[in-house]
């Protein structure tokens, strides 16, 4: 990819070429090149895109949370600081290159021999750099192998999961079998309890029989006590012998230690004798180990005797209890004596075996004493040999004194030679130290750049993962929001339809109410007219009744004729009164209907107002959500652009990492599917058998632990990103320190070069004598053996060749005259 540099005047400039370093060297000192931005195109591209983000933040269209704004502003400030630090480093490197070019120019004035030596030093430094690069590549290959190994482990874990699924089914089957087995075992336990009760009764009878046998053991205890006394006496004798042996061993060890101190001063022959002494010491140690084994056996016998004592005490306590039962068991004991006599004979045989073992131990002690005497004789012979070696040692010490005198003379000669070659040594050492420091700095820079590259790639992968997750989440949220919006729109349409329908119904009800009001008014008027007519008729009838009451007596016959008419009139009156009541009830019902309609109309109006308010709030929320979504999409799109601009090196490796990421995603999806399957299986198993639920819970906890470990690793890798800024700051401080060192070195080199020029002018090459050159050569060889590392054999060869050439040149002018 093309490199892009940023400047405050022109902004970002595309530069496809690579600018060489501003260092003037000879043909053999061609240094590497570096890009225009010194590997900081990532920061430049990030700054360009963050400027776009700042513009969008300042605009009205771009709206987002305050936290996001602060986060982006902090990023812009950090990137600006990085850019400033980058510029400072570039300036420092340019100053460094100028100073190095000046130093190289001064070095060209140095004689050819020094110039060639410096060239060879630089070539070897480059070779060392190549070796270090190869080592780094080897480490990368190792990491790739580790990644492959982890992939193999993942495949194995998959197989393990499949095997666990099969085992789970088998465990479910086994659970059913175990339930049946439990039922069987419970039945067997019931049978066993019955058997235990029977055996308990039998054991009681057997205990009574054992009491009889213990009486017979009393005789055996008497014999055992006699043997114990004899054994104690033997033990005391052995302890006295062991003490004597220990004292003699300690004395001999002290003598051997004093003699070893004397033997350390000897040289080659004494070393051989040491080997023989060590072999003898090993033999003595083996014998001491055998003595320790005998002690352990004695301790074991002590423990056995104590156990027997305990048994005897327990038997004595039980004998008191059994004496009371003696009279009852005398009749039975006579029959079983024969069996117990046979047991007593077995005990006697065991005692005989123990006596045999004691005899074997005595034989071993005798053999050890014999071996000890043999070792004493060998040590006496060794003492004679040591005396002989001491005499030889004195002779060798005299030879060493002679050699030391010779070496002192040689050292004086070497010191005289060192004084003539000290100036050249100092120059050589200084140049080596400078080049070593430069090589170290270059290696550190290379390692840091590799670490940054790895960290940036890892951040890319993490950011892509996060972005993919965020996209997935946003898509889901958008789908949910879209569905909710569609539902809200459908509800809004339904509400509009219902409001229209209700308005139409309300208008109908209003029209009906108005018509009903008009009808009621007409009916009321008619009813009033009818009431007036009826009142008039009633008045007439009352007058007639009064008249007829007065004339009742006279006109009883006429009343008989008028009775049917009265009945008809009464019926009409009752019917009219009923019609009045029904009309009154209808009027009250219609009034209630009017009140209900008014309440319904009021409620519908409130609902319509609420719907309108809700639609406005929903619209506002939709607008706010759309703005947030647009802001987020723009911010993430810009972040993607930043990340794409940062990827300019090692596209093949990045593709491989992406493939691995896809594999990991597939594997995570596969694990999620398996977790879902396991959860479903868990539900089934819980329904079938509650005892197997803990296994599924354990598996789920393992998966959660793995995810937690993965998240912890991600956090650790994120924390390493903060360390990169600190490394940049430390690099700037180191560069300043390096500038100061280079200034001091340059001043020192200028003084040394001026001295060399003065020496070259004062003394010609012909004036150099053979002795000075020989001293210089010897000094150079000695310096090689003392100062140079084994990796600089080639440099030694070149220096030796130069010395030979100087010798030939010095001899040639002497031979000519």
UniProtKB/Swiss-Prot annotation:
Coiled coil residues, start to end: 130-166, 217-594
Composition bias, Basic and acidic residues: 769-786
Annotated keywords: Coiled coil
Region entry Disordered, spans: 761-817
Residue spans of biased composition, Basic residues class: 804-817
PANTHER family: COILED-COIL DOMAIN-CONTAINING PROTEIN 175 (PTHR35347:SF1)
Protein name: Coiled-coil domain-containing protein 175
Organism expressing this protein natively: Rattus norvegicus (Rat)
Gene: Ccdc175
């Amino acid at each position: 990819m093309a490199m892009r540099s940023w400047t405050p005047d022109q902004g970002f400039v595309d530069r496809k070429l690579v600018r060489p370093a501003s260092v003037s060297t000879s043909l053999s000192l061609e240094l590497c090149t570096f890009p225009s931005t010194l590997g900081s195109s990532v920061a430049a591209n990030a700054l360009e895109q963050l400027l776009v983000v700042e513009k969008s933040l300042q605009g009205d269209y771009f709206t987002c949370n305050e936290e996001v704004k602060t986060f982006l502003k902090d990023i812009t400030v950090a990137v600006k600081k990085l850019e400033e630090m980058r510029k400072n480093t570039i300036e420092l490197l340019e100053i460094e290159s100028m100073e190095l070019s000046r130093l190289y120019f001064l070095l060209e004035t140095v004689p050819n021999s020094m110039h060639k030596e410096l060239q060879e030093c630089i070539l070897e430094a480059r070779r060392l750099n190549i070796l270090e690069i190869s080592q780094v590549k080897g480490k990368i290959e190792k990491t790739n192998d580790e990644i492959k190994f982890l992939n193999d482990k993942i495949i194995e874990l998959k197989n393990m999961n499949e095997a666990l699924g099969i085992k789970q089914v088998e465990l479910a089957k086994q659970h059913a079998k175990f339930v049946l087995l439990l039922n069987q075992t419970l039945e067997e336990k019931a049978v066993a309890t019955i058997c235990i009760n029977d055996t308990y009764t039998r054991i009681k009878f057997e205990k009574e029989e054992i009491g009889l046998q213990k009486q017979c053991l009393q005789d055996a205890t008497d014999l055992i006590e006699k043997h114990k006394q004899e054994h104690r006496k033997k033990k005391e004798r052995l302890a006295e012998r062991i003490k004597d042996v220990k004292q003699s061993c300690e004395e001999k060890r002290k003598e051997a230690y004093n003699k070893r101190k004397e033997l350390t001063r000897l040289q080659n022959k004494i070393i051989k004798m040491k080997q023989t002494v060590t072999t003898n010491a090993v033999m003595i140690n083996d014998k001491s180990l055998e003595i320790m084994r005998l002690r352990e056996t004695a301790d074991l016998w002590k423990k056995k005797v104590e156990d027997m004592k305990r048994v005897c005490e327990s038997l004595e306590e039980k004998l008191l209890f059994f004496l009371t039962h003696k009279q009852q068991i005398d009749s039975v004991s006579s029959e079983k004596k024969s069996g117990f006599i046979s047991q007593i004979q077995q005990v006697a045989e065991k005692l005989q075996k123990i006596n045999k073992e004691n005899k074997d131990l005595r034989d071993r002690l005798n053999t050890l004493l014999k071996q000890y005497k043999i070792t004493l004789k060998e040590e006496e012979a060794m003492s004679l040999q040591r005396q002989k070696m001491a005499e030889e040692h004195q002779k060798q010490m005299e030879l060493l004194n002679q050699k030391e005198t010779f070496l002192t003379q040689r050292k004086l000669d070497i010191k005289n030679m060192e004084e003539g070659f000290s100036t050249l040594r100092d120059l050589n050492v200084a140049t080596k130290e400078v080049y070593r420091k430069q090589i170290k700095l270059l290696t550190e820079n290379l390692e840091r750049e590799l670490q940054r590259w790895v960290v940036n790639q890892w951040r890319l992968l993490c950011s892509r993962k996060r972005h993919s997750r965020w996209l997935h989440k946003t898509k889901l949220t958008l789908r949910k929001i879209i569905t909710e919006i569609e539902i809200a729109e459908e509800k809004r349409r339904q509400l509009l339809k219902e409001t229209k329908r209700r308005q139409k119904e309300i208008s109908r009800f209003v029209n009906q109410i108005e018509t009903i009001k008009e009808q009621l008014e007409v009916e009321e008027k008619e009813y009033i007219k009818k009431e007036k007519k009826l009142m008039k008729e009633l008045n007439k009838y009352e007058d007639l009744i009064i008249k007829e009451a007065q004339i009742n007596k006279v006109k009883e016959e006429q009343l008989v004729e008028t009775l049917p008419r009265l009945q008809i009139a009464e019926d009409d009156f009752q019917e009219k009164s009923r019609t009045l009541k029904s009309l009154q009830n209808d009027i009250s019902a219609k009034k209630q209907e009017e009140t209900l309609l008014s309440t319904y109309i009021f409620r519908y109006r409130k609902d319509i107002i609420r719907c309108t308010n809700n639609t406005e709030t929903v619209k506002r929320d939709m607008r706010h959500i759309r703005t947030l979504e647009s802001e987020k999409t723009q911010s993430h799109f810009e972040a993607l652009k930043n990340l794409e601009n940062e990827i300019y090196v090692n596209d093949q490796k990045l593709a491989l990492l992406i493939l691995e990421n896809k594999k990991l995603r597939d594997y995570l999806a596969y694990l999620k599917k398996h977790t879902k399957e396991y959860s479903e299986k868990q539900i089934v198993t819980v329904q079938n058998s509650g005892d197997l639920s803990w296994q599924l819970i354990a598996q789920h906890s393992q998966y959660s632990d793995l995810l937690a470990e993965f998240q912890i690793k991600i956090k650790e890798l994120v924390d390493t990103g903060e360390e990169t800024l600190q490394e940049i700051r430390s690099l700037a401080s180191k560069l300043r320190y390096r500038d100061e060192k280079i200034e001091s070195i340059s001043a020192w080199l200028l003084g040394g070069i001026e001295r060399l020029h003065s020496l070259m002018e004062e003394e010609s090459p012909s004036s150099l004598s053979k002795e000075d050159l020989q001293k210089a050569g010897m000094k150079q060889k000695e310096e090689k053996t003392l100062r140079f590392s084994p990796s600089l054999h080639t440099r030694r060869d070149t220096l030796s060749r130069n010395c030979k050439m100087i010798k030939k040149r010095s001899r040639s002018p002497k031979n000519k005259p």
